[in-house]
Structure formats: structure tokens, C-alpha cells
């Protein structure tokens, strides 16, 4: 009996592995097709057909990866880019010692943009391992020698085209520029991968999630202004956005009630129950707000 059970388990695992290998292989063929200069519709739809036949055997994760990949064809850079206001970058004139400290304190990523003069003149990016290697070997290298190249993308560029360009150019970062050549945002290879496989949380993401939305007590919430309004609606159990509203974030909600970016300390009545106070902002954008609930939170919404 034990031998039979082990044999069945082994056979089941083998079948699951074979199925997963098939799905992954077909997905890679599909991606390769998008990157190919000579795309053939017959090959493309043949792959889709083979995947469709096996779709009933797919796990939910496998199916979602396939669905996300197919959706990617319709998405553009503007849909996923990190906006200019959220970009963290370092001046080209920064020396290696200062750069090391800046990255430790303020930069949570392995790659950091370098700009000359203003953020509209990004000269490339550095990888943290190159920096620490230079420091460890006590190389007195100018920052320029550590800079890796980035690529330029328009907001309207297709994500699949950007993915192909990153692959050709062997780079992980694209700077998104507007019609005047100014920096509009950035996209990383990780952003593109997450569009296919879903969000990949690391320790830093978990720390950010905790910092971005924090329930202080029954009547007070501290939130990043870029948090989606839908999350706030779910927590407080109150509708704040109409179907025809064009904003998505808490910051957008605030800006619909005032004519310009409000100063720190400004309080805005959103409804009879909700008051929002600006706790952090720049002249161009809201950063953080304090949400006061006059009637308090409904505990049922927190479970």
C-alpha cells in the first residue's frame, strides 16, 4: 500500500511538472514571437491554440500569467511608469562616499538614476554592486565610470516593444520623456515582469505597505496620497468616488475639492464624516494625508 501511494504521488508530481514545463515553454515561444522581426500569425495562433487546449489543466497562477501576457499587447508605457514626482535620483557631482551614504539612507533599490543638473538630464544609472565594489577596492573612480546606460521611451510606446528594446539594449531601466524631452517617469524591467507574473513583494514592499496606510485609532488614518480611493472606501465603508470621476487616488480626491495643491496643514471636508488634512506635500504634488472620521471606523470593515 505504501509503495502504491508513493508511486501515485510521484506520478502526480511528474504530471504536474510536465504540465508546467509545457505552459512555460509555450509562453517563452509566445514572448519570442513578439520579439521576432518576422512575426508569423500562424505560429502565434498555433501557440495560443495549444495553450487553450491545455487551459483546463492549468492552475490559477499559470492561467493568470497567460492572461496577463495577452493583455500586455494592449498596454502602453504610461500605464505602468513611475511618475516623475516619485523618482529617486542622485546628482552626477556626488562623490562615491556621499553616494554610498545617500543610497543607504534614501534609496531602497539596487539601481539608482544619476542626473546632471536637473532630472530632465538623466545620464544613466548605477548598480549598487558596482558602487560597493569600487568602495571595497578603494578605487578613486569618478562616478561617471560606474554609470550604466538607460534607454528612452515615449509614454505611448507599447510595453511589449519596450520589453523587446530592453532585451536588445541589455538594460534594465527606461526613462520616459514627454514631447519636450523632459523626464516624465521611468519603467524598470521589474515593472514589466510584474505585469506578467503579478506583483512581486520583497521586504521593502512590505515596509512600504505598512507605512503607506496606517490606522492610528478608531477615527484617524495616515495614508500616502497615492493610495487608491477604493482601498479607503473599503476600509471606511463609504462611497467617495462616482463612476464618472477621473481620479483614482486619495490625492486626486483632494485635488477635486481645491483649485491647487494645498499647503501642509490644510484641512478639507470631503463629506459629513470625513476630513482630510495635508501632512506632507511639495508645490507640485501631495505626499501624505491624515484622514479623520467623525463617526469613527466600523469594526466590521477591518476584518
From Swiss-Prot:
One Pfam family it belongs to: CorC_HlyC
Superkingdom classification of source: Bacteria
What is the protein's species of origin? Answer: Rickettsia prowazekii (strain Madrid E)
- Swiss-Prot/TrEMBL GO biological process terms: killing of cells of another organism
Q: Name one GO molecular function term.
A: toxin activity
Known SMART domains for this protein? CorC_HlyC (SM01091)
Family per record: Belongs to the UPF0053 family. Hemolysin C subfamily.
Q: Which UniProt keywords apply?
A: CBS domain, Cytolysis, Hemolysis, Repeat, Toxin, Virulence
Start and end residues of each CBS domain: 81-143, 146-203
Q: What induces it?
A: Expressed at 30 minutes post-infection during the period that most rickettsiae escape from phagosomal vacuoles into the host cytosol.
The protein's matches in Gene3D superfamilies, at most eight in alphabetical order, are given as:
3.30.465.10, CBS-domain
- Spell out the InterPro entries in the cross-references: CBS_dom (IPR000644), CBS_dom_sf (IPR046342), FAD-bd_PCMH-like_sf (IPR036318), FAD-bd_PCMH_sub2 (IPR016169), Ion_transp-like_CBS (IPR044751), Transptr-assoc_dom (IPR005170), UPF0053_domain (IPR051676)
Miscellaneous comment in the UniProt entry for this protein: Transformation of Salmonella with tlyC results in the escape of transformants from endosomal vacuoles into the host cell cytosol. According to PubMed:17301007, the hemolysin protein was detected only in the virulent strain ATCC VR-142 / Breinl and not in the avirulent strain Madrid E, at their current detection limit of 10 fmol.
Which protein are we looking at? Answer: Hemolysin C
